Design a protein with these regions (language model features):
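Alpha-helix capping/helix-boundary segments
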Residues: 11-12, 43, 94, 115-116, ...
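Short, well-structured alpha-helical segments
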Residues: 60-71
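Residues at secondary-structure transition points
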Residues: 21, 38, 61, 85-92, ...
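Active-site neighborhoods of divalent-metal-dependent phosphate/nucleic-acid chemistry enzymes
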Residues: 69-112
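Metal-dependent nucleic-acid phosphoesterase active-site entry motif
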Residues: 1-20
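Acidic, PIN/NYN-like endoribonuclease modules and their adjacent C-terminal/linker elements
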Residues: 103-139
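PIN/NYN-family metal-dependent endoribonuclease catalytic core
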Residues: 7, 22-52
Length: 139
């Protein structure tokens, strides 16, 4: 089974910094075509900008490799402007892409900052998404 998901930047960063973690499992599933990442150019730009912050000590080559891998497996989705207030305005695109994708797919938004988004059953933490996938595979 394939799962469609917008992956918040904090999940990607956590995975890169600690591969043997729940966020690392999420990205591993994305790189192995179990989770289909949903992106647009703004999301990809955010990934790059954050991963290249000096505090993460990642080279441009490493970041490019990560993003190339993500893009190779991702579906590009145009966001649709929604009238929703979020604590962090940069989170808006992740929510908007998720909502647009949900018009045709059972898409999720995977985030470590669940409190920054409206309470919806399709907005999940990395652990919740992993549990959903594991439960489905046991059925």
């Amino acid at each position: 089974m394939k799962y469609y998901a917008v992956i918040d930047t904090n999940v990607l960063v956590s995975a890169v910094l600690k591969w043997n973690s729940v966020p690392g499992n999420i990205i591993d599933l994305a790189f192995n075509d179990v989770i289909i990442p949903l992106v647009n150019q703004e999301i990809l730009n955010e990934y790059k900008t954050v991963l290249l912050r000096p505090k993460f000590h990642l080279t441009e080559l490493i970041v490019t490799d990560i993003l190339d891998e993500m893009k190779a497996r991702a579906i590009d989705v145009s966001e649709e402007h929604l009238d929703v207030e979020l604590p962090d305005p940069k989170d808006r695109v992740f929510y908007e892409v998720t909502m647009k994708a949900r018009e045709s797919e059972d898409a999720h938004l995977i985030t470590g900052n669940i409190k920054h988004f409206p309470t919806k059953p399709f907005i999940v933490t990395p652990r919740q998404m992993l549990d959903l996938i594991l439960e489905s595979s046991n059925e």
